[in-house]
Amino acid sequence: MAMLCAMLPAGAWAELELHMTNREQGNHTLTIFEAQEKADESAQKQDDEQSEVSQAAETANVQIETRFAQKKAEQLLSRAGASVQQSGELFTSGNLASMTLVWNGTQADGANGSSTIGLVLDLTTGEAVELARLFDDADAAFAAMENIISDDVLSELSDYMEYGDLLPMPTDNYAIDEQGLTVF
């Protein structure tokens, strides 16, 4: 199990932990992400601070479930003929946590295929971080990335891919890691 932590804002006496667990069941592999409050053994938390931290963990878990359909993936395991193979990555930088899930086999909608799903969370609030928030001038950054796609990527696409899938550049499915930004 991988476990990463990030400090909450000054004044809070707790940390939010993000866990990633890979669980094998028969020939299936599930990746489960979960946020929770880190136990604070050094001091008794005040009620308002406890509530703030618990709310951040709850918000993060709602974002995780909404994005990754973890409960649906578990339900698929009992369906005859379903095959689920997942692998995940977890990365933190400052108060951001980035999760990536590669899902092969039976998808949440029941279709067979492969998908890559990313989610970046603010560990102080548990909220999803929109891609535009990572840039001082999001419009200029997106335009520069779309120029790279137009100039360098489109000519390399195989025939089965649609150009429309890349431009305009999707901004709702991305992840960050030590290499930088990946848009899916």
Residue ranges and their predicted role:
Residues M1-A14:
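Sec-dependent N-terminal signal peptides of Gram-positive bacterial secreted proteins and lipoproteins
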Residues W13-F184:
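Compositionally biased intrinsically disordered regions enriched in Thr/Gly
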